[in-house]
Amino acid sequence: MFKGGMGNMMKQAQQMQERMQQAQEEVANMEVTGEAGAGLVKITMLGNHNVKRVSIDPSLMEDDQEMLEDLIAAATNDAVRRVEETSKERMSEITGGMGLPPGFKMPF
């Protein structure tokens, strides 16, 4: 009886690992856009934190450089935050039924 239960548990762990790997691939390929200055600066970032695109409203090109630099940094930080949130949500969808404690990281 124990062997059947253990075998079933191992099978579930393997399925979980496969779902986690698939979710990690999905997250790495997703795109999120961070914004600053009411959308005047936008940073599109992939789930692996690589910046794909930077969009700057032409009206900002006439303003001072320091403000533009601040907006780019803020938009980048917003994009990073959105990647982290989306990744966390996706992973919790998979591990939701496992009853894992908050912050627990899977070994795979």
Curated annotation (Swiss-Prot):
It holds the Pfam family YbaB_DNA_bd. Residues 1-26, 88-108 are annotated as: Disordered. The keyword Chaperone does not apply. One of its GO terms (cellular component) is cytosol. Transmembrane segments: none annotated. InterPro entries: YbaB-like_sf (IPR036894), YbaB/EbfC (IPR004401). It is found in: Cytoplasm, Nucleoid. GO terms for molecular function: DNA binding. Gene3D superfamilies: Nucleoid-associated protein YbaB-like domain. Keywords: Cytoplasm, DNA-binding. Residues 9-26 have a biased composition (Low complexity). NCBIfam families: DNA_YbaB_EbfC. HAMAP family: DNA_YbaB_EbfC. Binds to DNA and alters its conformation. May be involved in regulation of gene expression, nucleoid organization and DNA protection. Homodimer. Belongs to the YbaB/EbfC family. This is Nucleoid-associated protein IL1848. It comes from Idiomarina loihiensis (strain ATCC BAA-735 / DSM 15497 / L2-TR).
